[in-house]
C-alpha cells in the first residue's frame, strides 16, 4: 500500500498551493472532496482516476509525471483518496 505520510508531505509541498484543505483555488467547485470528484473527475472517484489526473493534469492543473516520481505520485493519490473517502478535508 502507498505511504500516506509521504503522500501528505508530497501534497503539502506540491499541491497545497491550489488545493490547501482539499479546496481548489482555480475552480472553486472542483474540490478534492468525494462528491466533487464523483461529479467532475474523469473516471469518477477512485484511486486510478486520481492517479491519472495527478500524472497528466487537466486544464489549469499541470501534469506532475515529470516532476514527481512514481512513488510520490502513488502516495499523493492515496493520500487524496484517503482524505476524501474519510471526509477528512
Curated annotation (Swiss-Prot):
Keyword Zinc included in the entry's annotation: no
GO cellular component: chloroplast thylakoid lumen
GO BP term, pick one: photosynthesis
Keyword Kinase tagged: no
PROSITE patterns noted in UniProt: CYTC
Subunit architecture: Monomer.
Family membership: Belongs to the cytochrome c family. PetJ subfamily.
Function text: Functions as an electron carrier between membrane-bound cytochrome b6-f and photosystem I in oxygenic photosynthesis.
The name this protein goes by in its record: Cytochrome c6
Amino acid at each position: 500500500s502507498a505511504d500516506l505520510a509521504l503522500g501528505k508531505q508530497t501534497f503539502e509541498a506540491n499541491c497545497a498551493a491550489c488545493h490547501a484543505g482539499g479546496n481548489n483555488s482555480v475552480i472553486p467547485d472542483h474540490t478534492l472532496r468525494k462528491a466533487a470528484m464523483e461529479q467532475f473527475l474523469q473516471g469518477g472517484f477512485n484511486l486510478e482516476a486520481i492517479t491519472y489526473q495527478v500524472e497528466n493534469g487537466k486544464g489549469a492543473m499541470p501534469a506532475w509525471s515529470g516532476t514527481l516520481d512514481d512513488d510520490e505520485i502513488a502516495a499523493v493519490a492515496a493520500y487524496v483518496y484517503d482524505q476524501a473517502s474519510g471526509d477528512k478535508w
